[in-house]
Amino acid sequence: VPKHLVVIGGGVIGLELGSVYLRLGSQVTVVEFMDKIISGMDGALSKELQKVLRKQGMKFELSTAVSAVERNGDSVKVTAKNKKGEEVNFEGDYVLVSVGRRPYTDGLGLEKAGVELDERGRVKTNDHLQTNVSNIYAIGDVIKGAMLAHKAEEEGTLVAEILAGQKPHINYNLIPGVVYTWPEVAGVGKTEEQLKEEGVAYKVGNFPMRALGRSRASGDTDG
């Protein structure tokens, strides 16, 4: 267990693993390029999770761009620039890099098959998950969208139903996402920020966990 772990990336993986080491006794510093953590989720959830994790002892450096990582003996030095353009440094025993994932398509022979990829290396598909090669379909982590097992499973079912002559449909807004920190964070549907951007009328409702009997009984009232 490292004494000090520097996490580059305040997304799902970085926070999940960072919070594990935090509970194991490490000092954890999260360095994030965006101005909030879990940027793909609702802003209210992001603020609440950051507040809870900060209370647990996790440190956050937001709007900070990492430019270099160097091994220095038994420690690792991270060089970055903050939102003021000033150079800042962080030193820890280990660095966890979690700045996103890319589709793993190496060795699939897509070039030989003539299957087209987009600018991010993902397989291009239409609404039926069909590639530009009519008899080849793609699902899961190699196409656009969240890299989630239950999303891939739903897409596999859709393709099977299409091949069986049916006309299925996936509503991606109904696919939930979960961050397994403590406490956990979950979301489904459009975020408040997305609704604002799209000009959709909406109402906001909040219910504090501390008002829930089970939460009070278990002593877990954050959220």
Segments (PLM) and residue ranges:
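FAD-site-proximal beta/loop scaffold in flavoenzymes
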Residues: V1-K3, N89-L163, H169
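Rossmann-like NAD(P)H-binding beta-loop-alpha module
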Residues: V1-K36, G40-M41, L148
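Glycine/Thr-rich phosphate-binding loops of Rossmann-like dinucleotide-binding domains
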Residues: L15-E16, Y21, T105-G107, E119, ...
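A Rossmann-like FAD-binding core segment of flavoenzymes
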Residues: L24-D127, K190, E197, A201-K203, ...
